[in-house]
Amino acid sequence: MNQSTTLAVVGGDVRQAYLAELLHEAGHTVRTFALERRPAAGCTAVSDLQACLDDARAVILPMPVQMGDGSLNAPLANAQHTIGDVLDAIPAGTLTLAGAVPFSVHARAVQNGLTLIDYLSREELAIRN
């Protein structure tokens, strides 16, 4: 039996919403932020970033994580959020997953004490994309 883990899915497109639903179906508690235009079934949509991140074992950010203007890739959000503000809100030591992470974002994550994994750099995903 799977043990429930609290996860935060922040930003992204329909792929992130679908991922949130799959994680919920697998038995996890999932909170979403910046996915207002595509609510994820079974997940708790949160309008406050800090509330979304509270007690989250891991934070899952989109691929690509950042838009050209430095904002979080969140086309389904009702508001724009800078990637810096998002990274600054994640508690130090939290496992953070993101795709296509530029050096500046990785450096900010390290500076903030985050454990950041670029899932696009994983061979099994890179080959398929």
What are these regions (language model features)?
Residues A26-G42:
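NAD(P)-binding Rossmann-fold cofactor-contacting core
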Residues L7-Y18, L23, N129:
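Glycine-rich adenosine-cofactor-binding loop
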Residues D13, E36, A100-P102:
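Residues in the short beta-alpha loop(s) of Rossmann-like NAD(P)-binding domains
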Residues S4-T6, T29:
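Residues that mark the start of a beta-strand
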Residues G42-D55:
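Short acidic low-complexity segments
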Residues N2, I60-R128:
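Glycine/serine-rich phosphate-binding loop and adjoining beta1-alpha1 elements at the start
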